[in-house]
């Protein structure tokens, strides 16, 4: 009856060891063997002996450390098989010609756009900046225009406190109220000049008739303070009352 020892199937039989040509005594322990004895005299094509393993040439994958034009494989290799690196670090094809910038992923073009700026974006930003610089006319609501017109019917000029109070009540700035009154006065003067063409001339005018001159009109146009300019307001109203009476007589005669 044969006795089967554990792990015996892992060791070659004596006949196999003898046929393989390895020559060492069977009674000598394996760890006490001379390394020269382990170098089996196998045929040149057998890759199992230590001498054959040590005498093998280095694989082609490790030859990248040497100069030349090695094929890049493994870590950091190119996705294109057969791609090589030259001495200057540029990528070469199989034929030895370097890749163009476009074949390397187009990074050069992106870098140029990043450094030089995108002309489309720069033109758009310039257009936006120019549109912001354009002066836009202020728009007023119907309520604001109605209040301004009613105030203009009462007085053609506003003093500083009145202008500030009106601007605050309408939610406007003082400059907007001031400009609106300036434009409205200009329109009112033009309209008054067109509607009163039959005014008596200087030759037909009575000596006591008072027609407001340009200086008087300028005096009337100046802002008045109701608290300190009472006498000035009284004189201006008297002059303009006489002028209005002359205008009313001229209209009745027509």
UniProtKB/Swiss-Prot annotation:
Disulfide pairings: none
* A GO BP entry: regulation of transcription by RNA polymerase II
Q: Which InterPro entries match?
A: HD (IPR001356), HD_metazoa (IPR020479), Homeobox_CS (IPR017970), Homeobox_NK-like (IPR050394), Homeodomain-like_sf (IPR009057), HTH_motif (IPR000047)
What are the Polar residues biased-composition ranges?
A: 120-129
Q: Which CDD domains match?
A: homeodomain (cd00086)
Q: Which domain of life is it from?
A: Eukaryota
Q: Which SUPFAM superfamilies did the record assign?
A: Homeodomain-like
Which cellular components does GO assign to this protein?
nucleus
Instruction: Assign the protein's first listed, main location to one coarse class.
Output: nucleus
Tell me the segments the record calls region Disordered. 112-140, 191-228
Name of this protein: Homeobox protein Nkx-6.3
Q: Which gene produces this protein?
A: nkx6-3
């Amino acid at each position: 009856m044969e006795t089967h020892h554990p792990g015996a199937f892992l060791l070659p039989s004596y006949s196999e060891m003898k046929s393989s040509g390895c020559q060492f005594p069977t009674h000598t322990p394996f760890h006490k063997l001379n390394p020269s004895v382990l170098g089996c005299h196998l045929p040149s094509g057998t890759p199992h002996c230590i001498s054959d393993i040590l005498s093998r040439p280095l694989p082609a994958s490790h030859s990248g450390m040497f100069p030349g034009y090695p094929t890049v494989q493994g870590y950091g290799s190119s996705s294109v098989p057969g791609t090589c690196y030259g001495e200057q670090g540029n990528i070469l094809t199989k034929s030895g010609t370097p890749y163009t910038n476009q074949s390397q992923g187009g990074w050069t073009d992106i870098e140029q756009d990043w450094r030089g700026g995108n002309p489309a974006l720069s033109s758009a930003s310039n257009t936006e900046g120019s549109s912001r610089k354009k002066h836009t006319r202020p728009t007023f609501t119907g309520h604001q225009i109605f209040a301004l017109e009613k105030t203009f019917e009462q007085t053609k000029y506003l003093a500083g406190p009145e202008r500030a109070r009106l601007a605050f009540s309408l939610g406007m700035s003082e400059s907007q109220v001031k400009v609106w009154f300036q434009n409205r006065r200009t329109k009112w003067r033009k309209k008054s000049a067109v509607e009163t063409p039959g005014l008596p001339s200087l030759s037909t005018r009575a000596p006591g008739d008072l027609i407001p001159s340009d200086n008087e009109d300028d005096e009337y146009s100046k802002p008045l303070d109701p608290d300190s300019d009472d006498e000035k307001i009284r004189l201006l109203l008297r002059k303009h009352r006489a002028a209005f009476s002359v205008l009313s007589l001229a209209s009745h005669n027509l």
